[in-house]
């Protein structure tokens, strides 16, 4: 696993993970002024993005750089504190937008069921409904090609040292 964090001024640093899996790469794209982290995941020619920011250029550049197809755009919940780029990203790539249970989007999207799984290359992203921050709040569990749990993307359900 290559896990890279990219801050709001474009600096990248590799973050250590205990297990090294060759079929998965994760980048965190962090915007400090909003305290918002988006995630770009690639595996075997496919990609997923979790909670994209409004400016979709950085995601499109990564997709082109890595020569991958964007398969899904995941949203952990409807965001009131920033404008998501999910609609523009979907329009640019034809990738479907995925929300968790109880979401009621006014646009075309997949409203996933609790426990539903989505394949991205050789990895799997599992939907875990976690209402609280919002009723449709969802965390996404990333599993490697062997079905081993690796990390969870919690959106605003969990904050560093706090709950959402």
Language-model regions, residue ranges each:
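Glycine/small-residue-rich loop that forms an oxyanion/phosphate-binding "nest" at active or ligand-binding sites
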Residues: 98-101, 108-110, 116
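Active-site neighborhood of phospho(di)ester-bond hydrolases with catalytic His/Asp-centered motifs
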Residues: 50, 71-79, 98-101, 129-132, ...
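Conserved beta-strand hairpin/beta-sheet module of binuclear metal-dependent hydrolase folds
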Residues: 24-68, 140-155, 161
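Active-site environment of divalent metal-dependent phosphoester hydrolases
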Residues: 56-57, 78-83, 104-107, 135-136, ...
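Active-site metal-binding motif and surrounding structural segment of the metallo-beta-lactamase
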Residues: 56-98
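Short, low-complexity intrinsically disordered segments enriched in A/P/G/S/L with frequent Arg
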Residues: 15-16
């Amino acid at each position: 696993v290559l896990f890279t964090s990219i801050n709001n001024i474009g600096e990248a640093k590799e973050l250590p993970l205990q297990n090294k899996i060759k079929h998965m790469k994760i980048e965190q794209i962090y915007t400090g002024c909003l305290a918002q982290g988006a995630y770009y995941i690639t595996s075997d020619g496919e990609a997923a993005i979790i909670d994209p920011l409004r400016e979709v250029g950085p995601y499109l550049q990564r997709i082109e750089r890595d020569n991958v197809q964007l398969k899904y755009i995941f949203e952990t919940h409807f965001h009131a504190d920033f404008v998501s780029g999910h609609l523009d990203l979907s329009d640019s790539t034809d990738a479907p937008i995925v929300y968790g249970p109880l979401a009621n989007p006014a646009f075309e999207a997949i409203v996933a069921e609790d426990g539903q799984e989505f394949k991205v290359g050789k990895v799997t992203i599992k939907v875990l409904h976690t209402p609280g921050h919002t009723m449709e709040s969802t965390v996404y569990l990333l599993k490697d090609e062997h079905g081993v749990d690796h990390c969870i993307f919690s959106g605003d359900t969990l904050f560093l040292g706090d709950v959402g």
